Regions:
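Structured catalytic cores of large enzymes
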Residues: 4-12, 42, 49-136
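A short, flexible N-terminal coil/short beta segment enriched in small residues
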Residues: 2-30, 134-135
């Protein structure tokens, strides 16, 4: 499944720090695959595909032990149960109860919206002024 050979790093993680998970429905859609490929190029990520849920890639995640996981998915395939299950998956890579990677969902109204989200995240958001509503 891997696109390249992986070496074990000093931190105990194999291969890359970044993994992209996406559905086979996204794989069949050229516009959405541009989003996947942009993430792959930007982060040197491995990409894994699933039929129904990211849980199908748990063995791959256990092998790679990524630090970051991005899920590229069409909005109609996302729901409450999807997110809850992903929270569980993020804690099942090893034996302890803690989250094993940071994860997020890249989506949009359409593939162009998802790509715009990706493009706008290139630079970190810096807050220069803020108003606090907490009184002491």
């Amino acid at each position: 499944m891997s696109s390249f050979a992986q070496k074990k790093k000093a931190n105990g993680r194999a291969g890359g720090e970044y993994v992209v998970l996406t559905s086979k429905a996204v794989q069949q859609d050229a516009a959405w695959m541009q989003v996947v490929n942009a993430l792959k190029e930007k982060h040197g990520a491995e990409v894994f595909f699933y039929e129904k849920a990211p849980r199908e890639n748990l063995v791959d995640l256990q092998r790679v032990k990524p630090r970051y996981v991005a899920i590229v998915e069409k909005p109609e395939n996302l729901n409450r149960d999807y997110v809850i299950d992903m929270h569980h998956v993020s804690r099942e890579v090893d034996e302890d109860i803690f989250a094993d990677f940071l994860w997020g969902i890249i989506t949009g109204y359409d593939a162009n919206g998802a790509m715009k989200m990706l493009d706008n995240s290139t630079e970190p958001l810096v807050i220069k002024n803020a108003v606090a509503t907490i009184t002491e």
